[in-house]
Amino acid sequence: MAVVNIREVYPGVSLGLWQMDEEVEQLFEQYPHLQAYKSSLEEKYKNDGRKLEFLAIRALMYEMLKANGASKGLLSHAGDIIHNEAGKPLFRGYHISVSHTKGYAALILSRNQEVAVDIEYFSDRVERISSKFLRKDENASDLDSKLVHWCAKETVYKLFSEENLKFDDMRVKPFDTMSDWACDVENLKNKKVAHVDFELTMEFVLTYAAM
């Protein structure tokens, strides 16, 4: 298995991280309940990378439910993640959010809070597109800060998925990537403020929130 960690990040909110370093067939062997998706995956995706993303999230869901003491009946349905018309993932009795990036998959879940997560691999490509997601009244002078702004806004977009927010509809309040490890993001449409925690590593930026 390739679970990096599963932890409670807020009361009643679990966050899981999976490193996708296995082959597709290994996941089918390790998690027999995923065999039910084999034919549909073959039809839908030609690329093994997309298949691996699909399976890794569902394997991670299984491990997180198991860690939370879920019944065998619920564990047998750990792959039953669907999406609504807005693209928001849904799972029976839980609020969930998922994200993938190069080599990693992340999942956050809660029974009673809206949750959101985003993960992006560490790259300077964000420099080239920063004008698309940064507002003029936001301060993001270095690469780390720009990555956090980007991921934090993606997280808040998911948190308010029904509102179909644009990047300019969100404003990240000033923060320090060296000491704060969290930032506040204002939804300018409804005036609500989301507290977004973030983690910076040599490989990725991870942001998550709950409301």
Give residue ranges: language-model regions.
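Core catalytic alpha/beta fold that binds nucleotide/phospho-ligands
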Residues: 1-211
